[in-house]
Amino acid sequence: MTHTTLFTSESVSEGHPDKVADQISDAVLDALIGQDPNCRVACEAVVKSGMVFVAGEITTNAWADVEQITRNTVLQIGYNDPHLGFDGETCAVVTAIGKQSPDIVMGVDGREDQELGAGDQGLMFGYASRETNVFMPAPITYAHRLVRQQALLRKNGRLPWLRPDAKSQVTLRYENGKPVAADCIVLSTQHSPEISQESLREAVIDEIIKPIMPPHWLDKHTRFLVNPTGRFVIGGPVGDCGLTGRKIIVDTYGGMARHGGGCFSGKDPSKVDRSGAYAARYVAKNIVAGGLADRCEIQVSYAIGVAEPTSISVETFGTGKIDEVRIQQLIKEHFDLRPGKIIEELNLLRSIYKATATYGHFGREEPEFTWERTDKAEILREAAGLAAANVTN
C-alpha cells in the first residue's frame, strides 16, 4: 500500500530584508576574522527603509569600516537605486558595538585550542538524507535553487524587471518516504511597476521554475502560484523590517529536521550555535554517505566554558543499517566535537561566512563549505562492517 504525504519548505532571496541583515552581519565577521582569526564577534543588523542599525559585541585587534562594509553589501545585493526606497549609497548606517563580556571571556579564551570552551550553552542539530545528490531534503534544496535562479536572471539582465526581494515555496508529494512529484510551487518576486501580471507569471514559470524543477515532477496536477496577491512592487526593507537570524529554518533543513533555536550569521566559530551545527551536519552527512543510514539526525549540546559536548544523540528514523547505539560509538571514535577541534578540522577561522548567509548553509558544493565533505564516509563504512556505499559528494 502506497503511503502518500506532502511536505513544504520555503526559501528567500538575497534581497529579502532578513537576508540583507544576515549578509551584513557575516560581511562584518569576514572583514574581522580575515585579519584576526581569534576575534570574538556577535554582530546583529536591523534594516528598514533608509536605515541600517548594526549592533553587537566585538573583541578584536583588527579594524573594519563597518559603515562601508554595510553600504557595499547593500549595493552588491542590488539595492542601488533611490527609486527602490532603499539604497546603499544614501541609507543611514548607525552602529552600537561593545566588547564581549569578561564573564564569557574567562570560559572561552586563554586555553589550548583543543580545550576551547563553548561560547554558550545550547543544542544543535545536523541532518542528512539520500533525497538529493547533496544529501539534503528535496523541498528546501529546490526552494533555494528557485530564488538563486531569480537572482541570476535579475543580475544578468535577462528579466530586467525583477527586483531583489523574492520568496519561494515548494510542496512535494512523497510516496513511501520518497519525493515523486511537485504538488505546489509558489514564487513571489518583487518587480518593476510596468510589467503585467500575465507577462510576469509566464516568464517566472518558463525562466525560473521549469529550468530548475525536475521535469518528471511537473504534471497536470502541479499548481503554480506566482505573485498570488497580483502585485509586488514595494519590497525589501521598505516593505518589511529585516533582522539578523530570523530565517533559521531557511538556513538549515526547511523544517525537515529539528532546530536548536540559535542562528548562525554574525557569529564567530567559538559560538557553538554555528560551529556545533556545522559539525553536526558534517557528522550526519558522513553517516548517510557511508551507508550507515538513509536518513540521519544528530543532536549535540554544550555548556558555556566547557569543551566536551554535554550530549550526543542519533536518530535514523528506522533507516539505519546498524544499531543507533553503535553509530553513536562510531561518532565518538571518529569525530572530535570539542569546539576547538571543530574549528581546526573544518578550518573555520577564515573569511568564508558571507557566502553562507544566502541560499542555505548546507547542501552547498563550494569548497569553502568544509562541513559538506564526505571524507569520513569510507572510514565509517569500514568501521561499521558494511559493503561499499555510493558516495556522490
From Swiss-Prot:
Note on how the cofactor is bound: Binds 2 divalent ions per subunit.
CDD domains noted in UniProt: S-AdoMet_synt (cd18079)
Swiss-Prot/TrEMBL keywords: ATP-binding, Cytoplasm, Magnesium, Metal-binding, Nucleotide-binding, One-carbon metabolism, Potassium, Transferase
SUPFAM superfamilies reported in the protein's UniProt record: S-adenosylmethionine synthetase (SSF55973)
Gene3D superfamilies, per database record: 3.30.300.10
InterPro entries hit by this protein: ADOMET_SYNTHASE_CS, S-AdoMet_synt_C, S-AdoMet_synt_central, S-AdoMet_synt_N, S-AdoMet_synthetase, S-AdoMet_synthetase_sfam
Domain of life of the native organism: Bacteria
HAMAP family in alphabetical order: S_AdoMet_synth1
Protein name: S-adenosylmethionine synthase
Gene name in the database record: metK
